[in-house]
Amino acid sequence: MQFNIQEIIKMIPHSYPFLLIDKVIACTPNESTIAVKNVTFNEPFFIGHFPGNPIMPGVLIVEAMAQACMICVISNDQGQNTQDYSVYFMSIELAKFRKPVIPGDTLIIEVNVTHKRNNTCKFQCHAQVENTLVAEAQILAMIKQNEA
């Protein structure tokens, strides 16, 4: 499955300037997702990080991973309303930042469910630019059905 930005906006609660996924190029619900973030000089975080040497903050790369995880577990192919669910992140472990991400880069984020139990999922996440690993992390999340 693939999702464009209009579909993503309907799926997850994030909006500008905190929506960090531009499109999903592959998604197998509850298994894996590959998402894209086109990093431009117009991103608001580049104003202060860092003037004259813009680098995407590592915490925002992890946030992009978390948003891809959210899409992975709330997307479905059965027509259910994805807004019926919320995803809460419980932990981020083994986060490593290997190379800087700069304006003009296309960040490819791949998340894979490595363990699922009841309403929790563990993900292995990788972010690449031009087939080079720039960041990785393990994320643990809880999926909760929203009350009506």
Curated annotation (Swiss-Prot):
Catalytic activity: a (3R)-hydroxyacyl-[ACP] = a (2E)-enoyl-[ACP] + H2O
GO terms (BP aspect): fatty acid biosynthetic process; lipid A biosynthetic process
Enzyme Commission number: 4.2.1.59
Keyword ATP-binding: no
Alphabetical keyword list: Cytoplasm, Lipid A biosynthesis, Lipid biosynthesis, Lipid metabolism, Lyase
Gene3D superfamilies linked to this entry: Hotdog Thioesterase
A cellular component annotation (GO) from this entry: membrane
Localization terms from the record: Cytoplasm
InterPro entries: FabA_FabZ, FabZ, HotDog_dom_sf
Active site per database record: H49
Family of the protein in this entry: Belongs to the thioester dehydratase family. FabZ subfamily.
Its biological purpose: Involved in unsaturated fatty acids biosynthesis. Catalyzes the dehydration of short chain beta-hydroxyacyl-ACPs and long chain saturated and unsaturated beta-hydroxyacyl-ACPs.
Name assigned to this protein: 3-hydroxyacyl-[acyl-carrier-protein] dehydratase FabZ
